[in-house]
Design a protein with these regions (language model features):
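NTP-dependent nucleotidyl-transfer catalytic core
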Residues: 1-289
Length: 289
């Protein structure tokens, strides 16, 4: 909603604006779902490396099941190092093109996108581009080679990193990790590749990133890397618009009674019911006064 408001304001001021949802569809969250699904249904053809037939058109899970699988897997990752390792391997193999995992990914995306379209339409939020991390993936190899050739990408403790610290920094700015020691690309890698893609497709004067303010350091690293490497022009503006979180009584991001993150749809429904009850209550008070 904040991004939609900023887009409309810039459009009113004369900018040609493009809203991009930038789906997080290529990272560890996908590996977690794949790993948890394999625990629950190991007999599925997606997990047979020797399978050569067509994969089912129908997903082996529903939206409600998918919404339960991910938080379960996310919690298990913190408690079970062996499961966490399997999720990392699944993420890497998905990114490398393993057919069965790509088929699961297609199921996840089809179900998730249908739900997202429905929710955003209800909020009157509209994106001109429905791209994600997966769309930036083809740009990564050439980008990495270019960063190596220019001396920006260096090896450190088995990982490929881009040092972005500057003299005068008042706080430590760690290197931007490009490729982890296990060979997997991460959030920063795809964010940089997305900037490459956007510069080639649109050459924008300004890019606004509207996310949780807890990602401030991440975007500081990515934006510095983009400018230092020449991925963007010196005059191209990169800005992180960090917003707060809705917190519970403990001061931490609000969760449901079950301990998971509340879905936006459920939050809107609860807020609507609360306001409706208050309106009725105020009407009763006014009529009895």
């Amino acid at each position: 909603i904040i991004g939609e408001a900023l887009k409309r304001l810039h459009k009113f001021m004369g900018y040609d604006t493009i809203g991009d949802i930038h789906l997080g569809d290529w990272g560890l969250q996908m590996g977690l779902i794949i790993a948890e699904l394999q625990v629950r249904q190991p007999e599925l053809c997606y997990f047979d490396p020797n399978y050569t037939g067509e994969y089912p058109k129908e997903a082996p899970f529903t939206l409600s099941e998918l919404e339960e699988i991910y938080p379960t897997a996310s919690l298990k990752k913190k408690e079970d190092p062996e499961f966490a390792e399997k999720a990392h391997i699944a993420t890497f193999e998905l990114q490398q093109g393993r057919a069965g995992y790509r088929a699961i990914w297609n199921h996840i995306m089809r179900i998730s996108l249908a739900d997202l379209h429905r929710i955003y339409d209800a909020l009157d939020v509209h994106y001109e581009a429905w791209l994600g991390e997966s769309d930036a993936d083809p740009y990564i190899p050439a980008m990495i080679e270019d960063l190596k050739a220019k001396g920006h990408a260096v090896m450190s403790e088995g990982a490929l990193v881009f040092p972005v610290a500057e003299e005068g920094d008042k706080k430590e700015i760690p290197p931007c990790i490009l490729i982890k020691s296990d060979g997997a690309a991460i959030y920063a890698t795809t964010d940089l590749a997305t900037i490459v893609q956007r510069m080639q497709d649109h050459d924008p004067d300004k890019m606004l990133y509207v996310t949780d303010k807890r990602q401030n350091l991440h975007f500081e690293q990515v934006f510095r890397a983009a400018h230092k490497s020449g991925i963007v022009k010196a005059e191209t503006e990169l800005e992180h618009v960090g917003h707060g979180t809705m917190n519970g009584k403990d001061g931490k991001p609000f969760k449901t009674r079950e301990g998971g993150v509340m879905r936006l749809e459920r939050l809107i429904a609860e807020m609507t019911d609360f306001v409706r009850a208050k309106v009725v209550e105020n009407q009763i008070v006014a009529e009895s006064a």
